[in-house]
């Protein structure tokens, strides 16, 4: 479409400036400060730098250490906020929110989320905040390139396999929405944003996200017309109250 931002031939949607050669030693030193008994873990990087997890870097690690006379080996996933010089998807990264949401969902439901282990919020260790969680075996639709682009296991899977993932996704969403007293349980997600209704907050968040993104990719007349239309046709009856 004319005047739309052009995206050329792209075969990678993420770039990481992370130095994978120094990462194991840095993570090992930090882990020694959070593991009990003064453990001195050995850390190796398995995969993940610049491969998937578009909104944050997702790095697969294996840590080995001695604890109470036992040898422990744990496969972990590090979720790391991107550096400013890389390709941040969001203007701010609240990994503490992600950590707490995953923890609560794991405690309150049977949704298959990984166990979250430790979080570093200052950015002093890796340059940006990160947290570690247990590695979970499975297959995940890729986001580099997005699975909707084709040429991946999900796009090429038979219809029954795609349906299996779709049904599991809907079941997980239904379970999440059945968490009792969710408004209070997850109130930390809306701190400082209580003046508007949920619908207004969501619209304003999407609009602010767009305003952040246009600095890097240019404006979209289609999206801007959509924002204008929504504001002119605001569903007053729904917007005036919180969802049931």
Where are these regions (language model features)?
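Short, compositionally biased low-complexity segments
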Residues: 1-8, 180, 197-198
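Juxta-kinase regulatory segment immediately upstream of eukaryotic protein kinase catalytic domains
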Residues: 2-45
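ATP-binding pocket architecture of kinase catalytic cores
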Residues: 46-225, 234-241
């Amino acid at each position: 479409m004319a005047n739309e931002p052009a995206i050329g031939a792209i075969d990678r949607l993420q770039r990481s400036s992370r130095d994978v050669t120094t990462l194991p030693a840095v993570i090992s030193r930090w882990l020694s400060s959070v593991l009990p008994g003064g453990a001195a873990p050995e850390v190796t990087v398995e995969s993940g730098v610049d491969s998937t997890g578009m909104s944050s870097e997702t790095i697969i690690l294996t840590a080995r250490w001695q604890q109470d006379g036992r040898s422990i080996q744990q496969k972990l996933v590090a979720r790391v906020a991107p550096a400013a010089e890389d390709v941040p998807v969001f203007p701010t990264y609240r990994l503490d929110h992600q950590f707490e949401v995953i923890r609560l969902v794991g405690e309150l439901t049977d949704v298959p989320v990984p166990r979250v282990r430790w979080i570093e919020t200052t950015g002093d260790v890796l340059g940006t905040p990160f947290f570690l969680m247990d590695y979970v075996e499975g297959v995940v639709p890729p986001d580099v390139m997005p699975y909707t682009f084709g040429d991946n296991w999900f796009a090429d899977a038979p219809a029954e396999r795609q349906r299996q993932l779709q049904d599991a996704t809907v079941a997980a969403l239904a379970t999440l929405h059945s968490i009792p007293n969710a408004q209070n349980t997850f109130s930390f997600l809306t701190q400082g944003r209580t003046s508007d209704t949920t619908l207004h907050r969501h619209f304003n968040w999407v609009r602010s996200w767009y305003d952040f993104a246009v600095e890097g990719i240019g404006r979209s007349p289609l999206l801007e017309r959509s924002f204008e239309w929504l504001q002119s046709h605001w569903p007053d009856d729904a917007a005036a109250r919180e969802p049931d």
